[in-house]
């Protein structure tokens, strides 16, 4: 069972009584056939539920009102099978607060050249019925997605499925609670921000709990539960000699397991699905949570270090969006560069907290080594390299008057050396279009040093996310040129200034 099983998307057909009962009966039959086929064959992440025809303003308004109040409804897919006068939709769309996709399709794939008549033309009017619906969306300045293609087309299926992921993610975000253990890393700017504005814009709440509250729960974990979890470690990871039974760091592994169990219990009891820690607020914990955080991220929790609640929330959102897709998604940080002409590289990592969902190795190494930050016992961590291939890094920043999402398309590559003295998980990548352009554009746009790294999601996914939440997006990819990028930042400043 996944999060998508908790939601459904309503399939709404627009028409009108002008065409008579026989035509409306045919429309209903077509709709039932299409919905059944999509649910059976399209591999959509959640179920489509066909609603009664929308043929009057009152019927359409009732559907939109019901969608708002049904927690299982993640959004609406609308098909204008015949012409449906768009003034009938105004009241419903005015109140609709769920994501909306217009499926611009028709029942037949090809025209019946020899038999086509006016009855056929009147029944199959998506071509201009969809344009009428599009006008009212534009007139009302209402953001909605449009997918054009036959309902049996695989590309249309993929696009609808991708939108469904966004819609479910948006619903989940409205219920998301972010727990901050301690505050921000002191004096850091980008990890701070307006939590009230974030809740208004995205729906997630952010609150702080004292580390002592967490320590209380950690200390309540039984030795039996700790030992059972360590047994799981033994079967899941390659244990270094120091972490094995009778190893000199075995106690550190036991303590890491206790912290993991305590953190998970605290998060479950509070209904949290994202959290932050900071090495400056560890009072009462014996080590910085490294292994615990890595494993919790792999279970779907959002996380970011140093109190960075925006990145923690974004990671959770992207984890939901990518559920069931190939590839992983993780907290990440641009750590250091490799400057080599024609082969500039970025080494991404963090002190400890990189999610194993992006690991190249089937069994990462579990080790305990010294950490010079935090002043605590040596922490346990998983060490691995990252899968290769196309990926993205994304950052959500607070500009005061708006939120900006930055996305850099990257290509992860195999680490050419074993890095024997680097005891942390890492990712190595080439930034598009090149490191100088990508880094300068990122800096000019105010991108954070913390990001969400994903093999599972792509630029189109993040564009949809930005559109659905009505936030600015700046893209750095192979098409980026700095003069045009700077111009776009200036134009965005004017555009969003007018919208205040």
Curated annotation (Swiss-Prot):
Taxonomic lineage: Bacteria, Pseudomonadati, Pseudomonadota, Gammaproteobacteria, Enterobacterales
EC category: isomerase
Cellular compartments per GO CC: cytosol
Essential cofactor(s): Mn(2+)
Keyword presence, Manganese: yes
Cofactor info, note text: Binds 1 Mn(2+) ion per subunit.
Residues that hold Mn(2+) according to the record: 306, 333, 350, 450
A Gene Ontology molecular function term of the record: L-arabinose isomerase activity
Name used for this protein in its record: L-arabinose isomerase
Assembly and binders: Homohexamer.
Pathway(s) served: Carbohydrate degradation; L-arabinose degradation via L-ribulose; D-xylulose 5-phosphate from L-arabinose (bacterial route): step 1/3
One GO term (biological process): L-arabinose catabolic process to xylulose 5-phosphate
């Amino acid at each position: 069972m996944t999060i998508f099983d908790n939601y459904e998307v309503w399939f709404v057909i627009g028409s009108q009584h002008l065409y008579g009962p026989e035509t409306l009966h045919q429309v209903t039959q077509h709709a039932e056939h299409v919905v059944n086929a999509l649910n059976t064959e399209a591999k959509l992440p959640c179920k489509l539920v066909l609603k009664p025809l929308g043929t009057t303003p009152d019927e359409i308004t009732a559907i939109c009102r019901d969608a708002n109040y049904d927690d299982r409804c993640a959004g609406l897919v609308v098909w204008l099978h015949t012409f449906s006068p768009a003034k009938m939709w105004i009241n419903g769309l005015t109140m609709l607060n769920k994501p909306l996709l217009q499926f611009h399709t028709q029942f037949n794939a090809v025209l019946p050249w020899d038999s086509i008549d006016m009855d056929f033309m009147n029944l199959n009017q998506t071509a201009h019925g969809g344009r009428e619906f599009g006008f009212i969306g534009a007139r009302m300045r209402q953001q909605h997605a449009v997918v054009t293609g036959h309902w049996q087309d695989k590309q249309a299926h993929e696009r609808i499925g991708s939108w469904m992921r966004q819609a479910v993610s948006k619903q989940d975000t409205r219920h998301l609670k972010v727990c901050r253990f301690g505050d921000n890393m002191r004096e850091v700017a980008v990890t701070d921000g307006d939590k009230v504005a974030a809740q208004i814009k995205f729906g997630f709440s952010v609150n702080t709990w004292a580390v002592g509250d967490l320590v209380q729960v950690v200390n309540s974990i039984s030795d039996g539960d700790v030992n059972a979890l360590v047994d799981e470690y033994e079967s899941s990871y390659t244990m270094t000699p120091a972490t094995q039974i009778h190893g000199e760091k075995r106690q550190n592994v036991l303590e890491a397991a206790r912290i993991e169990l305590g953190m998970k219990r605290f998060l479950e009891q509070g209904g949290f699905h994202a959290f932050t820690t900071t090495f400056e607020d560890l009072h009462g914990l014996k080590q910085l949570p490294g292994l615990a955080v890595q494993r919790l991220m792999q279970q779907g929790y959002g996380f970011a270090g140093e109190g960075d609640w925006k990145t923690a929330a974004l990671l959770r959102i992207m984890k939901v969006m990518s559920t069931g897709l190939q590839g992983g998604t993780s907290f990440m940080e641009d750590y250091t560069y490799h400057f080599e002409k024609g082969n500039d590289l970025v080494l991404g990592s963090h002190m400890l907290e990189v999610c194993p969902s992006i690991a190249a190795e089937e069994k990462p190494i579990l080790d305990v080594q010294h950490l010079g930050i935090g002043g605590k016992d040596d922490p346990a961590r998983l060490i691995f390299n990252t899968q290769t291939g196309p990926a993205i890094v994304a950052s959500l920043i607070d500009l005061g008057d708006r939120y900006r999402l930055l996305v850099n398309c990257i290509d992860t590559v195999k680490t050419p050396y074993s890095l024997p003295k680097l005891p942390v998980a890492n990712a190595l990548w080439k930034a598009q279009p090149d490191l100088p352009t990508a880094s300068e554009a990122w800096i000019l746009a105010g991108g954070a040093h913390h990001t969400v790294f994903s093999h599972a999601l792509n630029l189109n996914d993040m564009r949809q996310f930005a559109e659905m939440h009505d936030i600015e997006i700046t893209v750095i990819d192979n098409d980026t040129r700095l003069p045009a990028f700077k111009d776009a930042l200036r134009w965005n400043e004017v555009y969003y200034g007018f919208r205040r």
